[in-house]
Curated annotation (Swiss-Prot):
Organism superkingdom: Eukaryota
Biased composition (Basic and acidic residues): 1-30
GO cellular component: membrane
Gene name of this polypeptide: PRO-1
Protein name: Probable transport protein
Length: 567
């Protein structure tokens, strides 16, 4: 009994000694909020520069997939070119100009041109042409164009590998992102990302020139390794260096600039792809256009190298550092203690990825093409909307808590997947093609609105706020690993699954797309229910250790001293 009383006395002493410090900390935070500098200060601008360059490189790498795949499809589709010189200069296909005695000359393939071999002259003949087309392994039926076509571009498995290769690299890179950023610091992390990005971009150019798919995949994997690092390093740097009053607002900018990078890729695709004159009698230089798309990847990588040279090192250090910098103890919390929050990080990652955003981002040209728009025009519309809607997250981050905005976005995007993009698109639900396409396109735009205003920007802030300051690099790294696992599953499986559910390449692709979005919506609703009950940002008073030995000669960095509460 006496031992127990003695322990209680010691505990009460330690608490009483600590409470004045906490009161002082809260007072300091209040003073910091009242005396906060304007938003546009030199220090905040430096932090925003990190978000701008890191986010833009990340976004362009994401948006690169759909545009490059579409341009590559043009470079392998002989049927698109209507004049002899443009036909014979197609870079990645063995196209031949056929001269017909009747005057209907055309560009086709030496072995078989499916649209000519299985042509039909009346609607009554279409079922027979479809059956003969499907019986020929060299051809596939297009339900949107209602004709037999030669396969062009990447197959569904190649598309999945192309989209998933960078994500596989990001998955591996994010495993080491937290420890790496803590050990070598932010500046060296950015420098390494930029240098590796330049190497990967050179591989893009080489792959384009030689039409070597494996070189492209290796380049994507390599840049993914260090994009996994930057997706952790940029939010952590912002959390540690932005002024507490503006930390949340600057934090959402990583997603804003990610969407800007995606938009730049879409804009380049529109400029390079829509300017191809298929009916012009001359070389359309499709390969040069593909090379032009790769140039911006090189540019953003070089800017990241410059960022690593000119940016300041983080104010927070782990286990030592320069005098005057806040010190964090990485051993304060272990993975076992953080299991509940790590699991909630996985659920957040599920909301981010398993509701289908990357299916929309990577396959927007294909999806919008199947809904009646020109692929690159549809892609541009989607990505422009994607960027514009993200801007609304900046003022919202200062008015509402990150948790509330994230939860609203979770339920909203899930409902859009189910009731706008999924069920109405399923064959037989809508008898009018225009109505089906109109509802689906509206659903995709509303889905992007909810994701980019609410889910995406808040996610990167919550990956910090979910964990205590000393655990944030490791916690954010773990959450990013989960996010990239889900991302990889979606990118690789989406094209393969939709094609298989549709009944193969010649099946009605609307069926597979509808089932996929119904699946996304269902998973999103499950994640939403879990998050309503268990998603709560870290609160030092509520969640922190109640008994902590005072550190001698060290500056403790608590939640109150590095940022305002998110809830």
């Amino acid at each position: 009994m006496s031992d127990r009383v003695e322990v209680n006395e010691r505990r009460s002493d330690s608490v009483s000694e600590k409470e004045p410090a906490r009161d002082d900390a809260r007072k300091d935070v209040t003073d910091d909020q009242e005396d906060a500098p304007p938003f546009m200060t030199a220090n905040n601008a430096r932090v925003m520069l990190v978000q701008a360059i890191g986010g833009s490189l990340n976004g362009y790498s994401i948006g690169f997939v759909g545009v490059y795949s579409t341009l590559f499809g043009y470079s392998t589709n002989c049927a698109s070119f209507l004049q002899e010189n443009s036909c014979t200069t197609v870079p990645n296909a063995d196209c031949k100009w056929f001269v017909s005695p009747t005057g209907s000359s055309y560009c086709g393939w030496p072995e078989v041109t499916c649209r000519k071999e299985y042509a039909y002259s009346s609607p009554a003949e279409m079922p027979g042409a479809l059956a003969r087309c499907e019986a020929d392994s060299r051809c596939r039926w297009s339900y949107s164009d209602e004709e037999c076509q030669n396969p062009s571009g990447y197959s569904s498995s190649e598309s999945g590998i192309f989209a998933g290769s960078m994500i596989a690299g990001c998955l591996i890179g994010s495993v080491f992102a937290g420890p790496l950023a803590s050990k070598i610091g932010a500046r060296l992390s950015f420098l390494l990302v930029g240098l590796v990005g330049v190497v990967a971009s050179v591989m893009y150019h080489a792959s384009c020139a030689a039409d070597e798919f494996w070189v492209l995949i290796v380049g994507r994997f390599v840049i993914g390794l260090f994009l996994g690092v930057i997706c952790v390093a940029c939010p952590v740097y912002t959390d540690q260096n932005a002024h507490p009053k503006w930390k949340r607002t600057i934090g959402v900018m990583f997603q804003v600039f990610t969407t800007l990078g995606i938009f730049v890729a879409a804009l380049m695709g529109l400029a390079l792809g829509q300017s191809i004159r298929f009916d012009h009698d001359g070389d359309q230089k499709v390969m040069a256009r593909m090379q032009g798309l790769c140039v911006f990847s090189t540019l953003f990588s070089l800017l990241t190298v410059v960022l690593g040279i000119v940016t300041r090192e983080s104010r927070a250090k782990f286990d030592g550092g320069e005098e005057g910098r806040a010190e964090l103890n990485p051993s304060e919390y272990g993975y076992v203690e953080m299991i509940p929050r790590l699991l909630m990080g996985c659920v957040m990652a599920g909301t981010l990825q398993l509701t289908g955003i990357n299916a929309v981002m990577n396959y927007a040209p294909t999806i919008m093409g199947s809904l009646g728009l020109a692929p690159l025009v549809g892609n541009f519309v989607v990505m422009l909307w994607n960027f514009v809607t993200t801007l609304a997250s900046i003022p919202l981050s200062y008015v509402f808590t990150m948790r509330h905005v994230f939860l609203f976005g979770s339920i909203f995007t899930s409902c859009m997947c189910l009731f706008m993009c999924g069920i109405p698109v399923y064959p037989g639900v809508s008898k009018k093609l225009e109505a089906k396409n109109g509802v689906a396109i509206t659903g995709i735009l509303l889905f992007i609105l909810g994701f980019e205003v609410c889910v995406g920007p808040c996610y990167y802030v919550l990956t910090q706020d979910m964990f205590p300051p000393s655990f944030r690099p490791r916690g954010a790294s773990f959450t990013q690993v989960a996010q990239f696992i889900f991302n990889l599953i979606i990118n690789v499986c989406y094209p393969i699954a939709t094609e298989s559910i549709s009944g193969g390449p010649s099946g009605n692709q609307d069926k597979g797309q509808a089932v996929a979005f119904i699946f996304f919506g269902g998973l999103g609703l499950i994640c939403f229910v879990i998050q309503v009950f268990f998603l709560h940002p870290w609160d030092e008073e509520r969640d922190g250790k109640k008994v902590v030995a005072p550190a001698i000669g060290k500056k403790e960095l608590s939640e109150e001293s590095i940022g305002n509460r998110a809830e």
